[in-house]
Amino acid sequence: MAEEDLYDVLGVKKDASEAEIKRAYRKLAAKYHPDVNHEPGAEKKFKKINEAYETLSDDQKRAQYDQFGTTGSQAGGFGGQGGFGGFGQGGFSQGGFGDFSDIFGDIFGGGRARRDPSAPQQGRDLQYTMTLDFMDAVFGKETSIKYNRSAECHTCHGSGAKPGKSAHTCSTCHGQGYVLRQRQTMMGMMQSQEVCPTCGGKGQVIDPADQCDTCHGAGVTEERHELKVKVPQGIDDGQQMRLQGQGEAGKNGGPYGDLYIVFRVTPSRDFKRDGNTIYVDQDISISQATLGDHVQAKTVHGDVDLKIPAGTQSETKFRLRGKGVPRVNGNGNGDEYVTVHVKTPKTLNKRQREAMLAFAAASGEDVKGVKAGFFDKLKDAFEDNK
């Protein structure tokens, strides 16, 4: 028989926030607690609620459950950072192997040191994707963003209790956050530690009547957070920026997590970018390439004068020092490279044709040319009469 989905156990959606999960757990735990609910099956239901909360309130276990539909060693994989991969430090975390070390530690008398359930814990990190226009990425900008996050409850200041009320030590685990269970194994009677089913591993409980009316005992609420962001100059597509303390609220008075902004830059029609270097295409005529000229070349800093030497060949590149993208650290600008393309006219009027034939003759070239068609002759006549 398939096990009931843990999200269904708590009555929340799969994308529920930490605050929503905690609020649902508090409500159900108060309803099915064995001390207040003596109906048949209430204790079993209460245990299932605690098991669901133990998994879904832990970032690592929740990510593993979402991926494999289970937790612990059954998944057989490495754990991640719970909903926010790619920004933390490299390497593997213990993931699904944590349960094994707990069990073996209990069997052989050692075990890992248990974390104090009331110790402050940092909040979860968040990710925000910001789309930038090409020029805004080059020169930076100041803007405002809005996003949802869990924040410390302004009424109870994170305690979860009404003003004048407070949590008290859990009578089941006596503040330890876990209980000892004995089970028969092939090696005899063994003792293991499990998360306290009453307090969910926190070591403290708040009576339902004493819970904060705003956050319902969760200590956090969902908010639409607005933040001013100064985008630095020289940001490139795919780069990220960390804003400390702008993530979700911590637990037990712990610090907020961080916000990571990932930048997506809209391509430009005029410029191509590679790091701090800009590439531009510039069309010039045969006359300009042959005789030389000065043209206005586009740069991200505005148009500049570009000298075209006489005899310039098509696809020649010119370097404009310091006309590229400003470096993020403020240490100058990159360069720009202008590639010139000599454009050959598709049609010539009569005077242009005669001039080109004369040029060919002066160059010792026996160029016969191709006779112009009716429409070309008509166009030449029109041009000559101007």
Swiss-Prot record:
Question: What are the BP-aspect GO terms?
Answer: chaperone cofactor-dependent protein refolding; DNA replication; protein refolding; response to heat
Positions annotated to bind Zn(2+) 1: C153, C156, C212, C215
Q: Which domain of life is it from?
A: Bacteria
Instruction: State the PROSITE patterns in the record.
Output: DNAJ_1, DNAJ_2, ZF_CR
The record's section on Gene3D superfamilies has: DnaJ domain, Heat shock protein DnaJ, cysteine-rich domain, Urease metallochaperone UreE, N-terminal domain
Where does the UniProt annotation locate this protein? Cytoplasm
Q: Which SMART domains match?
A: DnaJ
Q: What is known of its domains?
A: The J domain is necessary and sufficient to stimulate DnaK ATPase activity. Zinc center 1 plays an important role in the autonomous, DnaK-independent chaperone activity of DnaJ. Zinc center 2 is essential for interaction with DnaK and for DnaJ activity.
PANTHER family given in the database record: CHAPERONE PROTEIN DNAJ, DNAJ HOMOLOG 1, MITOCHONDRIAL-RELATED
Oligomer status and interactors? Homodimer.
What is the protein name for this chain?
Chaperone protein DnaJ
Please tell me the species this chain comes from: Limosilactobacillus fermentum (strain NBRC 3956 / LMG 18251)
Q: Lineage, please?
A: Bacteria, Bacillati, Bacillota, Bacilli, Lactobacillales
Gene designation per UniProt: dnaJ
